[in-house]
């Protein structure tokens, strides 16, 4: 009887130690799935911001012609929203890129995302400066 209890205890200990040494693969799978979904969502949001930037560029051309104060304020609001969203994403992805458990492909994805976000912030900021430089006509 002592032998069976000792054997059972040894099996339980071996299972616990092997689980500790090998690690929990399910956690890695969940983390990889989360990373993949996060990158897909980021790609969608970047695409939306790029389309918004294109639309705002067209509105800027109209602003140059009409010099409308309301249009200027609307463009600046939308640029501020897009820029703040991208700055928040930049902080998050800078933090995530420092993780040590990333493989080569994941690290590349994070670095590519960081550079894409930085470029979008730069473009949004440039357009905001152009819009701010337009003096609205108060007579319309």
Swiss-Prot record:
Region: Immunodominant conformational IgE-binding epitope; residue ranges are: 20-53, 108-140
Biotech application, in the record's words, is: The Pichia pastoris-produced protein seems to be well suited for in vitro immune cell activation assays and for in vivo applications such as immunotherapy and skin-prick testing, because it is properly folded, free of endotoxins and has the appropriate allergenic characteristics. Non-allergenic peptides identified from the mapped major conformational IgE epitope-containing areas could be used for the engineering of house dust mite allergy vaccine.
Q: Where are the transmembrane segments?
A: none
* Temperature optimum or stability note: Thermostable. Upon heating, unfolds only partially even at 95 degrees Celsius. Upon cooling to room temperature, almost completely restores its structure, indicating high heat stability and refolding capacity.
So which residues are the signal peptide here?
1-19
Write down the superkingdom of origin.
Eukaryota
Q: Where in the cell is it found?
A: Cytoplasm; Endoplasmic reticulum; Vesicle; Secreted
Main localization (coarse): cytoplasm
Keywords tagged on the record: Allergen, Cytoplasm, Endoplasmic reticulum, Secreted, Signal
Q: Which GO molecular function annotation, any one, does this entry have?
A: protein homodimerization activity
Gene Ontology cellular-component terms for this entry are: cytoplasm; endoplasmic reticulum; extracellular region; vesicle
- Matching InterPro entries, A to Z? Mite_allergen_group-5/21, Mite_allergen_group-5/21_sf
Tissue/organ expression: Expressed in the epithelium, lumen and microvilli of the midgut, and in feces.
Q: What is its quaternary makeup?
A: Monomer. Homodimer.
Q: Record's family?
A: Belongs to the mite group 5 allergen family.
- Specify the protein name: Mite allergen Der p 21.0101
Lineage of the species this protein comes from = Eukaryota, Metazoa, Ecdysozoa, Arthropoda, Chelicerata
């Amino acid at each position: 009887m002592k032998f069976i209890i000792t054997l059972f205890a040894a099996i339980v200990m071996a299972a616990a130690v092997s689980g500790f040494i090998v690690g929990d693969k399910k956690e890695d799978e969940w983390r990889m799935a989360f990373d993949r979904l996060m990158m897909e969502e980021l790609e969608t949001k970047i695409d939306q911001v790029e389309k918004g930037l294109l639309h705002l560029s067209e509105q800027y051309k109209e602003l140059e012609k009409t010099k409308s104060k309301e249009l200027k304020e609307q463009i600046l609001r939308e640029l501020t929203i897009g820029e703040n969203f991208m700055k928040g994403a930049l902080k998050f992805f800078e933090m995530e890129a420092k993780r040590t458990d990333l493989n080569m492909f994941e690290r590349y994805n994070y670095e590519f995302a960081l550079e894409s976000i930085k470029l979008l912030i730069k473009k949004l900021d440039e357009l905001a400066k152009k819009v701010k430089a337009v003096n609205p006509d108060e007579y319309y």
